């Protein structure tokens, strides 16, 4: 990346909870009154969001298994980040229960003496990668949206053509 650009994702930045990568010209959004006025309300940060796409497995049973795992890992990851679940604080026992569920469902061991957030983020990425390696149904999805809505997928052909869209005027 150029010198004054940063790549931000949930591995590198603690408060990023979206399953995406972000290339930005600043590490933080600047929303001070003077700068907003100077730049016509535009925070002096610009960037590009990069959403990864994965193919869905041909076997519906395998597809549902990955969706359940990805959903559970993501929920626990968010709970760790915000230290709350369903608008209420999670106790250590509740968190431990959910981490044990992830371990059981995914067949992994999570070290309690290391960063839970980093381990879960890695596991989340690994599960989406593994899902994409299954025999493909020919359908592609944005995993972040698909995890909540199983109907969010499109034929692979949709992503194989480019459409030029002019930028401003």
Predicted feature residues:
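Short, His- and charge-rich active-site/binding loops that engage polyanionic ligands
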Residues: 67-72
